[in-house]
A protein has these predicted regions:
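An N-terminally biased module of ancient metal coordination in phosphate/nucleic-acid-related enzymes
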Residues: 1-72
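Active-site gating/metal-coordination segments in enzymes
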Residues: 63-131
Length: 131
């Protein structure tokens, strides 16, 4: 009986350095300082018999979240998107509602290592945003 389970790689990043600045990215001639888009990944997934991938944010902006969701809508092998939203914003619920309407939002993440406030998670506005 053939294996009917899908293989999903749960963490890939796509970026377009002409759209957003990625301050964490090393300066040229870094191998990272170029666009990484679906065409860069498609053959690798096929060669390794991976059926789908999940895109994970590399920039802390809703603009990038929409960019990744645009890609997800147009790319069959993208199973979902892990995006960033400002959990401390009073509008976080509305922003999440709009992103969820896009269809492939599967999670959100906050990069705590980049947050100067070590107590970020225990702040009242963060707790409110997580609810």
């Amino acid at each position: 009986m053939p294996n009917s389970h899908k293989k999903i790689d749960s963490h890939h990043h796509f970026w377009d350095i002409t759209r957003l600045d990625y301050p964490w990215m090393p300066a040229p001639p870094s191998v990272l300082r170029r666009n990484y888009l679906p065409g860069d990944l498609a053959q690798l997934l096929t060669r390794n018999e991976i059926d789908a991938t999940v895109l994970v944010q590399a920039h802390q902006s809703v603009e990038e979240a929409n960019f990744l969701l645009d890609i997800a809508e147009d790319t069959d092998f993208v199973a979902g998107v892990v995006a960033w939203v400002d959990l401390t914003s009073p509008d976080v619920g509305d922003v999440l509602d709009e992103l969820m309407k896009r269809g492939k939002l599967v999670s959100i993440r906050h990069q705590v290592e980049d947050d100067p406030d070590l107590a970020w998670l225990s702040r009242e506005n963060s707790i409110r945003g997580l609810r």
